[in-house]
């Protein structure tokens, strides 16, 4: 859509999308706030502190791969916050690849992570692009803690991680919970 706005936040009308918009505004990074409902997008953006100084554009899209590809054209990075990712992610990641953009999301859904690794990772790498799911604090912090625990400790054969939260889940998070319980769960045993 615009080479002047290198970041597209897809799902910017949600809680995480607003936080990302706030971060981008703070660092003077131009962005497109995209989603399925212009009125909700505009309302959420009004609540971003200092938004009046941001270089951003609100774009409504119905979410088809073709339409998303047009919205993403000219951007460098697509930040997908529209879960459940197992349902909403495939079209967004395909459009990001079509538009030649790096892709990241805030998901933590195991089925979606497996799909990105199995279907999309190599396609992005072949084009010199990055597909990075699960970049939000829930997944990223746990991953960093696990790596720190295992550094230099080859004898550990089991590590269980529990992430606990305070507060109430958002509507989007609730939808993700119900999506996840309908998918198969996997675990590594002896790293296989």
Residue ranges and their predicted role:
Residues 5-27:
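N-terminal Rossmann NAD(P)H-binding glycine-rich loop of SDR-like oxidoreductase domains
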Residues 10, 15, 151-192:
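Active-site-lining helix/loop region of Rossmann-like oxidoreductase modules
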Residues 13, 36-38:
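Residues in the short beta-alpha loop(s) of Rossmann-like NAD(P)-binding domains
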Residues 30, 40-115:
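NAD(P)H-binding glycine-rich loop region in Rossmannoid oxidoreductase-like domains
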Residues 33:
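Short beta-strand "acidic-cap" motif of Rossmann-like dinucleotide-binding folds
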Residues 48-54, 124-127, 154:
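Short helix-capping segments at alpha-helix termini
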Residues 107-130:
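Rossmann-fold NAD(P)-binding glycine/threonine-rich loop
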Residues 127-166:
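Adenosine-phosphate binding glycine-rich loop
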